[in-house]
């Protein structure tokens, strides 16, 4: 009952979070956030990353890694507002939606407190669990058709004011923590991949790729070969990829054949192109865990050859039966490779970011073959569906 099994993420609601005043981002198998620079795409990703890091690093560090509490607050006419997030998901086999919500408030001295925190989990076997955290106490429960409902309560105290209640929320907290850890963000820094890396924990893929060698080394032979074959579809000539140990550090060794028939040559990571290292890291993140989850990739087109973009998108879409995928992009070529229903428009208006699906009047000329989504993107004519 505690293990969630397959999970499908449905939506995330953002209230007074960074540039978002009030918005809901709905997920599907594959979605792409498109919009101008500074429209709010990265801020939506920041919300997902914050939730992902709560069970891994704790709420205080997760907030600190975003620049601190004050940086998270949306400002309307100069006045800061307190942020809140709500993630809705569904466990396969359950007949009801589950959720986790978190609301933060300011206190003197630039600090924060958890105003409200709650979760509801509905399991495939008919069981359910949940918790509610207020200013002074946490109340949790668990019930199942085969046993009586059990309830637990305890006080939070001032020492827990800035902490998440998930570790203390028993069954619901354990399940929600496992669900949040299935959110994975990828923002690869090729320089981090190229440099010699410290051996590290293989449980968490660092979004910048700084521990990708350790993650790749933890794969079994079949998965390593799968990564190699998929990278070869993007970067012609890749024959093999291995982890090399140099003293107490790790790096990657690529073997690549040339088109002139000469013997394949070996290259260390620092000798490979940024595009190759980015594509490799994205594939490792994609295949690191066969459990269902949501993989978020910021601007996958950066440093990747134009001709390889469609191949990368095809590889990503081929995994959506197992893993939901969200990307942010400015690439018209990527947009042209996606169904219209996969696109989400992000725009900034009247002091706040917004997100919505494509407007129907935008879809009609595309469906009639008069224009492509990529051409509309280039001309800033991907209009959102405004309620």
Residue ranges and their predicted role:
Residues 1-21:
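N-terminal pre-Walker A segment at the start of P-loop NTPase domains
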Residues 29-68, 279-280, 331:
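Phosphate-binding glycine-rich loops of NTP-binding sites
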Residues 94-229, 233, 239-242:
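Electropositive, glycine-dotted interaction segments
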Residues 232, 236-287, 294-310, 366:
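Conserved ABC ATPase signature
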Residues 1-4, 310-387:
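C-terminal lobe/lid and adjacent interdomain/linker elements of RecA-like ASCE P-loop ATPase modules
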Residues 6, 22-28, 287-290:
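Phosphate-binding P-loop
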Residues 77-80, 93-94, 286-289, 317-321, ...:
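Conserved catalytic network of the ASCE P-loop NTPase/AAA+ motor domain
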Residues 46-112:
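Conserved P-loop NTP-binding catalytic core
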């Amino acid at each position: 009952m505690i293990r969630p099994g397959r999970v499908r993420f449905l939506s995330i609601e953002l209230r007074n979070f960074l540039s978002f005043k009030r918005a809901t981002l709905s997920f599907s198998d594959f979605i792409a956030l498109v919009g101008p620079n500074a429209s709010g795409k990265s801020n939506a990703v920041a919300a997902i990353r914050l939730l992902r890091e709560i069970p891994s690093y704790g709420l205080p560090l997760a907030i600190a890694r975003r620049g601190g509490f004050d940086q998270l607050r949306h400002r309307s006419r100069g006045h800061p507002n307190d942020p809140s997030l709500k993630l809705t998901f569904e466990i396969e086999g359950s007949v009801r939606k589950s959720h986790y919500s978190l609301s933060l408030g300011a206190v003197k001295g630039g600090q924060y407190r958890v105003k409200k925190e709650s979760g509801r989990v509905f399991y495939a076997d008919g069981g359910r669990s949940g918790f509610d955290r207020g200013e002074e106490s946490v109340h949790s429960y668990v019930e199942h058709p085969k046993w009586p409902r059990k309830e637990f309560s305890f006080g939070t105290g001032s020492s827990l004011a800035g902490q998440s209640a998930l570790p203390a929320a028993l069954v619901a907290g354990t399940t929600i923590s496992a669900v949040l850890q299935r959110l994975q963000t990828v923002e690869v820094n090729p320089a981090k991949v190229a440099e010699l890396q410290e051996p590290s924990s293989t449980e968490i893929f660092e979004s910048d790729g700084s521990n990708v060698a350790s993650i790749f080394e933890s794969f079994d032979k079949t998965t390593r070969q799968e990564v190699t074959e998929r990278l070869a579809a993007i970067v012609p000539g890749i024959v093999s990829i291995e982890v090399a140990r140099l003293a107490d550090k790790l790096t990657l060794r690529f073997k690549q054949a040339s088109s002139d028939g000469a013997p394949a040559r070996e290259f260390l990571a620092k000798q490979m192109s940024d595009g190759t290292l980015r594509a490799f890291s994205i594939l490792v993140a994609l295949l690191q865990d066969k459990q269902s989850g949501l993989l978020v990739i910021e601007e996958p087109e950066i440093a990747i050859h134009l001709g390889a973009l469609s191949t990368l998108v095809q590889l990503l879409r081929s995994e959506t039966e197992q893993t939901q995928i969200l990307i942010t992009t400015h690439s018209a070529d990527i947009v042209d490779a996606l169904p219209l229903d996969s696109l989400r428009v992000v725009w900034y208006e009247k002091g706040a970011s917004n997100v919505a699906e494509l407007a129907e009047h935008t879809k009609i000329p595309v469906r009639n073959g008069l224009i492509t989504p990529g051409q509309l993107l280039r001309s800033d004519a991907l209009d959102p569906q405004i309620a």
